[in-house]
């Protein structure tokens, strides 16, 4: 019986952890606003601090970053003596520069409360070297490709002698290859692989294996992943010793869900020309106004094209920031920092570079203008909202017709989406025409936007044709006129997919292309010079090589048609041979053959069912931080 007045400790209270956390860590956590541990933190931190390898799967916004940072810091500060100069005690590997930067930022906020480590955060003067200290402290170094050279990284390492490295795989491998960087068993304590499935998706498997080969086997390892696929399982077998698996799921009425309970996932059925009017209606009607929103497009070229068009039509209170994988590293970092630091309503216009790994705080709304090519990415896009218990809304725009099959397709994968009903989003053809006219006005004002639109539309069609759910997203079903108008194009581009299309490629826009000018005077002058030279050179005569290359160009759909025709012919020949074989058999032989066929079909169905269940469990459980 409990003693009167004695209060039972909340198992998710930070001071209830065993082993207990240092007082300064409790102060740091309190300052960050984390009153209680999330389930993944409560499950992971005690095990990881207590000499266990861990494999952690959890839904998005579950607080995984602190789940490994706290144990790593505690391990380094509980050593019997400081780590030797130029020896590494811990490494955290991240798949992207942005995520590595965020992890380092959270670590810096944490270490600001530990006086010896906070002192090490101050940059050294030119030529000054970090003095050895008898006091235990954490000295970190962030390694990012594209921002510094490997030589600069090594120079900084030798100058600061960090004991904790946070890095992307390629740059880490380059540093570990130096004879001046040491990771012996006597010094090295812990390795963390964050977003392990993403590391493998991005093709870092060879780099990871080389990194593991340079580290001592006697170490603690934490693997954090949205899902433990077969490839991730291989890393687990090679790199971890008897790990404890921690899987944190969200219970729903229909069983386990792959997303937080605070996230509403919805869809709207809109033809292409109504997508942007529906977006503006959604942004205007939501109450309270979403402070941070993310809009997903399928390609980098589409982001570059639509950014100036959306800036011209968005409600005035919304700022727009773009981010995609083809931006130079400094531009990506600048734009990302601008979006995160924004205090007024801001929209991030992006591709799947922001679908995983970017821990963007307080995202209210996610809108998917284009469904992702990989169905797995759908979950991770949605998961940017509704993090850490905060309410969030995700809306995907689907075209009426075959794309509606995407709804049951997602439900099979434990990702149910519902029709968005409140507030009611209604658009009209007239409203769509007015908006398209405003966007087209921007395009007509600068030929550079025309060029961007042509490239972006071609890249979008290619992305659409490569969709993994190819039976749902079919190029053959696209309405080219509606799409061209939705994109505010003034001409449909020359592309193989439109070769046999007999519609109006001018979209009804009367335009003298010879007088269609660039805003940039230098580009416009160059265009006119080139046009004059072409006029003086006489009629264009293609070379034999150009003619041959033109003949080789085929639409994706045509290639598939040829493959299908070959497959059909093979199938017909196979059936004919089978009929001839059966004609030569006795009745008894036919009966035995039919019995074997039934058994084989039953076995195939059993394997298929098991495969579907396994895929649903493995591919769609959890999100990344």
UniProtKB/Swiss-Prot annotation:
Q: Name one GO biological process term.
A: assembly of large subunit precursor of preribosome
Q: Which Pfam families match?
A: CTE_SPB4, CTT_SPB4, DEAD, Helicase_C
The residue ranges flagged as biased composition, category Basic and acidic residues, are: 553-570, 577-597
CDD domains in the cross-refs: DEADc_DDX55 (cd17960), SF2_C_DEAD (cd18787)
Q: What residues does the Helicase ATP-binding domain cover? A: 45-246
Cellular localisation: Nucleus, Nucleolus
The protein's GO terms of the molecular function aspect are: ATP binding; ATP hydrolysis activity; RNA binding; RNA helicase activity
Statement: the UniProt record of this protein carries the keyword rRNA processing: yes
Which reaction is the catalytic activity of this chain?
ATP + H2O = ADP + phosphate + H(+)
Residue positions annotated to bind ATP are 58-65
The yes or no answer to whether the keyword rRNA processing is present is yes
Q: Which residues form a coiled coil?
A: 557-614
Motif range for Q motif? 14-42
Which terms are listed as keywords in the entry? ATP-binding, Coiled coil, Helicase, Hydrolase, Nucleotide-binding, Nucleus, Ribosome biogenesis, RNA-binding, rRNA processing
Entry-linked InterPro entries: CTT_SPB4, DEAD/DEAH_box_helicase_dom, Helicase_ATP-bd, Helicase_C-like, P-loop_NTPase, RNA-helicase_DEAD-box_CS, RNA_helicase_DEAD_Q_motif, SPB4-like_CTE
Question: What is the top-level taxon of the source organism?
Answer: Eukaryota
Cellular component (GO) terms are: 90S preribosome; nucleolus; nucleoplasm; preribosome, large subunit precursor
Helicase C-terminal domain: which residues?
A: 278-436
EC number(s) on file:
3.6.4.13
Protein family membership: Belongs to the DEAD box helicase family. DDX55/SPB4 subfamily.
Describe the task this protein carries out. Answer: ATP-binding RNA helicase involved in the biogenesis of 60S ribosomal subunits. Binds 90S pre-ribosomal particles and dissociates from pre-60S ribosomal particles after processing of 27SB pre-rRNA. Required for the normal formation of 18S rRNA through the processing of pre-rRNAs at sites A0, A1 and A2, and the normal formation of 25S and 5.8S rRNAs through the processing of pre-rRNAs at sites C1 and C2.
Query: Entry's PANTHER family?
Result: RNA HELICASE (PTHR24031)
Description of its domains: The Q motif is unique to and characteristic of the DEAD box family of RNA helicases and controls ATP binding and hydrolysis.
* Name of the protein this chain belongs to: ATP-dependent rRNA helicase spb4
The UniProt gene name for this protein comes to spb4
